[in-house]
Amino acid sequence: MLNYLWLALVTLAVLIGGATGRLREVTEGAFQMADMAVMKIALPLAGIMALWLGVMRLAEQSGLVQKLAAALRPLMSRLFPDVPADHPAMGSMVMNMAANMLGLANAATPLGLRAMRDLETLNRTPGTATNAMCTFLAINTSSIQLLPTTAIAILASQHAQDPTAIVGTAFLATICSTVAGVVAVKAMQNWPMFRVQPGAAAAVSPSVTPDPIPLRLPPAPAPLPAWGRAALILFIALFAGLFFWQVIAPTAYQASTAHLHRAIFPSTVVAPAAEAAAPLPLRAIGMLSLLAVPFLLGFFPLYAALRGVKVYEEFVEGAKEGFGVALRIIPFLVAILVAVGMFRGAGGIEALKSALAPLLTPLGFPPDLLPMVLVRPLSGSATTGLFTELVQRLGPDSLTARMAGTIFGSTETTFYVIAVYFGSVAVQRARHAVAAGLIADLAGVVASVIICRLMFT
């Protein structure tokens, strides 16, 4: 399916560009997106990948990943029946889903790539996506969001009266998109057109063949001593105290930290944080997102060290894979983003808007949302620009702006996710993953419009 979509984007871009006199824009779009794929996405991702793969190595060697997978075994076994309950992929997928829920994009992508690498160890047809890979991608493109931070930030920057009004609508919409994605991927995996034929592996070019990934079960770590348990309890209590102090008494927390900051850095001025004025539930979610990364970066090495793991050596061993993964995804990123850039430069998005507007307007779908909805599966940065322009033009408190913010927070750049995740393990036959991801996006869009009409009118 991905072959036909890619060919359609490229061919239509050339035809539309030739018919409308925009071939120069088509060429510029191709070159700009090729440069972006390498210089602004793949290479910066290498450092982030190295960090989180190193941290995941510590979690794996200390036995934390296995414990997390065991705790969620009943749910994960139903979603991924082809993956053994004690397989490392279970823990990697759980970590990725948790990061997505908290809006930790810098952590979610490396953890998701690690999960794909673990799932590849179970793949009997290299180059072809397994059912577990397709299910994981469908969940990833529709993951439940507790706090759509980017959409809220854009609404707040345009002086919305209540920029956090979309938190509830985005949460409900992501539930709908997740359910739709899971149902779609499970229903389509046995369709004849998507079924994997026994022994039929996709042809994989030697230049992109993934390295063999042995299933490494870490040795049993040393038992946690009593004083080690006390140290972990103290560490957790410290973060719990920070969390509740900021959530329950944010003004006192900011005053105390500002006083300490002035004592240590007397020449700097501390600006008051905006979270103090937010409602308590939003402060709780915001503080959870803020503390999550520092907690993980501190807890995993501490736990591993207390269980006898050589933390520096194991971190470096895990981080070694980061650059290799970034290199492997470059051809797939270039292919997808170049096609998107050409189609957008040719005016294909505007043409689709003109064709679909007469059909969707009678159904209560605002035509102003169409460009953003059409671009969303293709490009995150372009969607951000379109959303910002829409908010500026219609007002941040308009119904359409709130619909757009809800859509932004409940959908995903499906083709980018496919290129990065499948590219990391050289999967060329995506099977039903694309269709399931787009169905999840469509469900998120429809749910966003309906929920916003019910809540804001």
Model-derived features with residue positions:
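Alpha-helical transmembrane segments of integral membrane proteins, especially early/N-terminal helices
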Residues: 1-13, 59-69, 134, 139, ...
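Hydrophobic transmembrane alpha-helices of multi-pass small-molecule transporters
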Residues: 1-41, 199-327, 454-457
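Membrane-embedded alpha-helical segments and adjacent helix-loop junctions characteristic
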Residues: 24-120, 307-392
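Membrane-core helix-loop-helix motifs of multi-pass transport proteins
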Residues: 119-235, 397-457
